[in-house]
Each structure stands twice: as structure tokens, then as C-alpha cells.
Amino acid sequence: MIKLKSILNFLYNITNRDGFKGYKECNAAAYKNVCNDSSTKSTSKLALIISYTQNLLSFKNIIGLMLIIFAGILFYAYILQHEWQYVTLSDEQVKKYRISEKKALSLYQLMKDTHELLTKNNIKYWIESGTLLGAVRHQGIIPFDDDLDIGIMHEDEIHLQQILPQFEQLGYRVKHNKIYVICGERCLDIFLFHKEKDKFIHVIYDKYPNDFFYDHELYPLKKYKFGSIEVYGPSDPIGNLNRQYPEWDKYAIIYSPHSLHLPFLSNIEKKSKFILTPELLKPAQPLGPLEDRVNLF
């Protein structure tokens, strides 16, 4: 019969030694102790082989499998970094990506309130980034976008600060950390721009180096159709859009709200381009009804 003490020593050494070195040492020690019992030599060898195999499969193979999976993810991310995936979505698939009617209404209402408050207080603004893309390409909110972006000149920051309480009176929350964020059910980001040489750039330009305007691109501001309302935007948006969103007039990029946010996976979602179809070109719905809240002040 296999010695109980030898088996216990074998298990103790496995759980208390580091890595495969400790594993091999304890296995050798157990093998020596067990096999010295001549009366049970053949039985002990079989038991030892079974035990060794089970432990090898349950530890080494699990580690190996994890490494294979990790390597596969890295390879997939690498491929997507170097090659775009072009996908055509059916109308039914597009509908799955669309924001809800409640979100769409809250975004249009937020844009309407912001436009009226800033205009009423003589603060010049323009739609920016994805909001600008939505106005140019969809004549409204991009159907799978979930926030709003506008820009103002830094000279108007003090005037903006003076009217922030009016946003709060409308039930919005106001936050500030480099950019101003106006939040209800959805949020609107206000970027502060300044002129540097021949460019208008904003305070987090280092993070978005392609988001700038040349003087002739920005001024004079003009109006854009945005759902059921009108908003102000740059004079010539094409240069800015081409820099930020190459092939924006042919393809859409849909970002998943369920991202794992892992650095090596950051390009997986960004590298899928969806061919623009009539359904994808429709703005977020519904466009209204919207309330006239600012005029109540």
C-alpha cells in the first residue's frame, strides 16, 4: 500500500514551492519515497504517473491555453490595426445600433437649449467633431452617437461662466475640467479654442491633433439644419472632417458602448467601417417635439 506520509509530503511540496522547479523537485522526492516501498512498487508507479499527469494537465495546460488565447487576441488587434474591415449592414441591423428615441429627444432638446442660451447672450459657438459630422452628413444627430460637441473662443469663457446658472435652472448639471460639460440625460461638451499661428485649436488639442480649423474654414460661421432646429457651424467643414474622419462621406464608424477599454484592444472597434446606406444616413429619430424652455426666462 502506498505510504500516506509520502503522498502528503508530495501534495504539501506542490502547494508550497514556486513554479515548475518546485513541482519537479517535490515530484522527484515523492517518487523516491514512494518507490522505495518495494511491496507496492508497481502500484505506486502507476499512481504517481496518474497523479503527475493530472497535475500537469490541470496546471501547465491551463497556463498554455491562456497564453494561446492572449496571443490570439494580440494577433487579432494587430491585424485590425493594419487592415480595415468593411461591412454592409442590413436595415434591421442598423436599427439595433440606433440610440433610443428617449436619448435622441434629450440630445435635440439639449442642443436647442444650448443654442438659444448662447445666442441670447451673444456667445458665438459652432458645432464640432461628431456633432458637425452629423449636421453635414445626416442633417441631425448621427443615429448611433450619444453626446454633443461645440466650440467657443476662449475670450468668451467668462461670458459662458456667467450664464452657467441658467443651464442649472433648466435642470442641467455643469462640470468643468479643461472643457465644460453640460449634462441632462445626455451630455454636451464645450471646447475652448484659441488661435495659434494659422490654426484655431482647443485646450485638448494634444489628444486630438487633427481637430483644428484654419481661419478660412471656421469663419464666417453659418447655419446648419440639425433635426428640426438650426445651429451654427464652421464656414467650410470639409477640411476638418477630412482630417478627423477620413472617408466620412463613404463609411461610418460605429463604436460599441460595451468596450473592454483594454489598450491592446483599442483599435478593434475603431477598425470596422460600415458602408453608408440610406438607413445609416437618416438622423437619430424622433426630431421632436421639443420644448421652448429658454424663452421662459
From Swiss-Prot:
Keyword flag Transferase: yes
Transmembrane segments: 62-82
The entry's keywords: Membrane, Transferase, Transmembrane, Transmembrane helix
Species classification: Bacteria, Pseudomonadati, Pseudomonadota, Alphaproteobacteria, Rickettsiales
Any GO molecular function: transferase activity
Protein name per the record: Uncharacterized protein RP688
Major localization listed first in the record, in broad terms: membrane
Membrane-related topology note: Single-pass membrane protein
Subcellular compartments: Membrane
Family classification: Belongs to the LicD transferase family.
Domain RPE1 insert: start-end pairs: 9-55
GO terms classed as biological process: glycoprotein metabolic process
GO cellular component: membrane
